[in-house]
Amino acid sequence: MSKKYVYLFTEGNATMRELLGGKGANLAEMTNIGLPVPQGFTITTEACTQYYEDGRKINDEIMAEIMKNVEKMEEINGKKFGDLTNPLLVSVRSGARASMPGMMDTILNLGLNDDVVRAMIAANPTPEFERFVYDSYRRFIQMFSDVVMEVGKKYIEQLIDAMKEKKGVTFDTELTAADLRELANQFKAE
């Protein structure tokens, strides 16, 4: 049997910190004691080691295990990635065996895309919800651009600042849904 690289939160516990990292072990433990933790999974520290050994590539075995667990998560949560009526949105958080506050990356709202955003807004066409959805999408693209695509945070912040200046506002919260949609499109263009 091959090595296990992915654990649902229900499969881990607090003693597995070396394998699951601090966040993964704690999420598993919170699940075990019955706290209301949305179901998810942890990719092990051994998978990270293998990723580096494979030249910074996720090998087929690990990818298959990740996809199998995504399917389990979809089933458990009753949602599906890319579904226009009931999309699954997840947070991706990096972790380590030891606590490193402020050093680990996060991507929120993985699962949002242009089609999902339009469908969500069509299902609840209020100005407040439209702004909320576009702000979430803008934040997702911003985090993804920084963490995955390695587009510098400073550059992204310059785009946001330019939009605020163009609109004559001081705070991100003063940007409209249309402004946030335009920012999301600018981020994707980069």
Describe the residue ranges of each PLM region.
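Nucleotide/phosphate-binding sheet-loop regions of phosphoryl- and nucleotidyl-transfer enzymes
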Residues: 1-190
